[in-house]
């Protein structure tokens, strides 16, 4: 399995819009080919930071998802979200 791990900076003045957008994002990601599991979280120590981790069956599926996320930067910006990191990770173990 492969995961796309992201870190994001959030404009907290747009929190309501981000919460609404997240519902649609999660629903859409669930439909992605090879989707296994996803997590969207907010950093406890830095509330304007979000951490995401989305797992796919294959490297190719994860790469395609990462490309789609990168291409979606304008919509992210419209919601007060800026990407600070986006990594492809090979899952070594799960529990």
Q: In which residue ranges do the predicted regions lie?
A:
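Short, surface-exposed ligand-recognition loops at beta-strand->loop->(often short) alpha-helix junctions
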Residues: 9-21
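An amphipathic, aromatic/His-enriched active-site/gating alpha helix that lines ligand/cofactor pockets
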Residues: 23-36, 55-88
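Short coil/turn motifs at secondary-structure junctions
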Residues: 11-13, 43, 57-59
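Glycine-rich beta-strand-turn "strand-cap" elements at beta-sheet edges
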Residues: 2, 9, 37-48, 71-95
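Intrinsically disordered, low-complexity acidic/polar segments
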Residues: 15-17, 61-63, 95
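Short hydrophobic/aromatic beta-strand micro-patches
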Residues: 7-9, 53-55
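Short phosphate-engaging motifs
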Residues: 13-14, 25, 48, 61
